Amino acid sequence: MLRKTKFVETPLGRVYISEKVLEHTDDNPNNEPSWRRKNVKYGLLNLEKPQEIWQGYNGNYVFVNLFDTFMLDKNKQPKRVTLFVVSVTSKRGRWITFYCEKNDIAKMEKYRHGKLIYKDGNLP
């Protein structure tokens, strides 16, 4: 589990900042420049309000829709998830990389155009 070191208040709640850093390479299919960033701090954010704009701990603005904070379970019922927001990877905010903790297994996911695309992965 991430060690919570401090937090930042946002309109959607507290963002807990971890001292851990992340190095991540993102292959972009839309011919946008590849993204590689070191020493990216990430935090814990529990999304509760739809269509809010909040300023993240790294100064980026992110558009959030309430529906995207849920995943469907085996019975196709929505299940609330808690997101570990990592970074916004483009100025337009089209790509948001984050981690989702579910049943002690961390999944790396991408948020793009209002859809969640799931990929296997682990917290660094």
Kindly give the residue locations of the regions a language model identified.
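Ribonuclease/tRNase effector modules and their secretory precursors
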Residues: 1-124
